């Protein structure tokens, strides 16, 4: 079992503090949902864990199996088994999907450990079929001209190919219709097992109807203020964040 620990994490952007002391433990074998209103720091948390240089960690630790990874670059964190599926994936002209994924799978490996072309194609075909993706998607430039739904499927395809220890899934349900949501959820559920953990960031219960979390954490004002099981997400759907904030004595203003 691998453990990702976030201890008293404070993160600022351009001098403004966004995370104000986050404490969180993720374990392989578990799926945790991070829920909360807009602007509360959910995406900042995933970016800080992955090492985005635009986010300054001013205090705290991020430990992967007991080792503080704060001084590691993004690619080093990825090689240790961290994966981030972004809400708005970048387009990279000139590099095909297949080229990108094979390079990512072989990064940092000795020649004898690199996946062969044959094994790569076999695995790629299998995972694309699982997600209902056309074969031509493999030869298109990375995310270039992709629809929102295609980009999200492509992020999950990368997840299935790379098989990380921990996936940070930042609003993968954003902008998806119900059919695309089911496909994306199917891909995430395919990964579930004792060697995989996930942190799913979402505003809504809808995604969690298809990916049942083991744990639900509610973020407000840069902190985790409440934790529970899947029933907590259902409660949020009924009461909204205002009800939770009132119970906890937290000042909260609903968006108009």
Swiss-Prot record:
It is found in: Cell membrane. It is a peripheral membrane protein. GO terms for cellular component: plasma membrane. GO terms for molecular function: ATP binding; ATP hydrolysis activity. SUPFAM superfamilies: P-loop containing nucleoside triphosphate hydrolases. The lineage of its organism: Bacteria, Bacillati, Bacillota, Bacilli, Lactobacillales. Residues 4-246 form the ABC transporter domain. InterPro entries: AAA+_ATPase (IPR003593), ABC_transporter-like_ATP-bd (IPR003439), ABC_transporter-like_CS (IPR017871), FeS-cluster_ATPase_SufC (IPR010230), P-loop_NTPase (IPR027417). The keyword DNA damage does not apply. It comes from the Bacteria. ATP binds at residues 36-43. Belongs to the ABC transporter superfamily. Ycf16 family. This is Probable ABC transporter ATP-binding protein M6_Spy0273. Its main location: membrane. Keywords: ATP-binding, Cell membrane, Membrane, Nucleotide-binding, Transport.
């Amino acid at each position: 079992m691998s453990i990702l620990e976030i201890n008293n994490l404070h993160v600022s952007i351009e001098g403004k503090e966004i995370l104000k002391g986050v404490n969180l433990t993720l374990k392989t074998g578990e799926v945790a949902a991070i829920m909360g209103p807009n602007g509360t720091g959910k995406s900042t948390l995933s970016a800080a864990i992955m090492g985005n240089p635009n986010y300054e960690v001013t205090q705290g630790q991020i430990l992967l199996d007991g080792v503080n990874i704060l001084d590691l670059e993004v690619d080093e964190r990825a090689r240790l088994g961290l994966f981030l599926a972004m809400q708005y994936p970048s387009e990279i002209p000139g590099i095909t999907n297949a080229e990108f994924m094979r390079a990512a799978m072989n990064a940092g490996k000795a020649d004898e450990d690199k996946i062969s072309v044959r094994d790569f194609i076999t695995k790629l075909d299998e995972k694309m079929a699982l997600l209902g993706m056309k074969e031509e998607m493999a030869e298109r430039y990375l995310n270039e001209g992709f629809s929102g739904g295609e980009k999200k499927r492509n992020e999950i395809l990368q997840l299935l190919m790379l098989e990380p220890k921990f996936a940070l899934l930042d609003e993968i349900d954003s902008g998806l219709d119900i059919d695309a949501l089911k496909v994306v959820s199917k891909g995430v559920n395919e990964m579930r097992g004792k060697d995989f953990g996930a942190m799913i960031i979402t505003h809504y219960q809808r995604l969690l109807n298809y990916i049942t979390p083991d744990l639900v954490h509610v973020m407000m004002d840069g902190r985790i203020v409440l934790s529970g099981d899947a029933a907590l997400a259902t409660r949020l759907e009924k009461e909204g964040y205002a009800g939770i904030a009132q119970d906890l004595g937290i000042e909260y203003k609903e968006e108009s």
